[in-house]
Curated annotation (Swiss-Prot):
EC number: 7.-.-.-
Gene Ontology cellular-component terms listed: plasma membrane
Membrane topology of this protein: Multi-pass membrane protein
UniProt-listed NCBIfam families: PRK05151.1, rnfA
Protein name: Ion-translocating oxidoreductase complex subunit A
UniProt-listed GO biological process terms: electron transport chain
Positions of transmembrane segments: 5-25, 39-59, 62-82, 102-122, 134-154, 171-191
This protein's record includes keyword Oxidoreductase: no
Amino acid sequence: MTDYLLLFVGTVLVNNFVLVKFLGLCPFMGVSKKLETAIGMGFATTFVMTIASISSWLMDTFILVPLDLLYLRTLSFILVIAVVVQFTEMVVRKTSPTLYRLLGIFLPLITTNCAVLGVALLNINQSHTFMQSAVYGFGAAVGFSLVMVLFAAIRERLAVANIPAPFKGSSIGLITAGLMSLAFMGFSGLVKL
């Protein structure tokens, strides 16, 4: 049980997908202008990453490896992710039309989010078991959501701050992301993976 807890904490804080592995930067920068949009995208991405991580592990273990179709791994993972995203989009549209409108084009773009594909591929490359894949996928998603929500809160405060003209917009956003990355480096001694 402690192994799963260490894997979770290590994935969320120490090896964060956005700030350490630099995966998922497009939605990180694009959806983080408003806090409520970032929270909604975080929930949707958490669901998709966790389910896609489990589904891709199952596909690899029970279909691709036994049939020696490893060359189709990336393509099949993208297909699994696309199916999970479509399912998520249907659920969000039915349960929260406001959130569906707020997320707009970013919800279907979860399919091309490199963090979602990255967690599926890293699970296989690190030879995780089923439970480790589920914990790793959930931890990566929680870390992604945590960083996106924190970044959105900071960007909302920066929108009303007195920032010099050359630094407004994406410039201050990238500087802020860099400072957040430095702050998360403080967790590097927390868990040895």
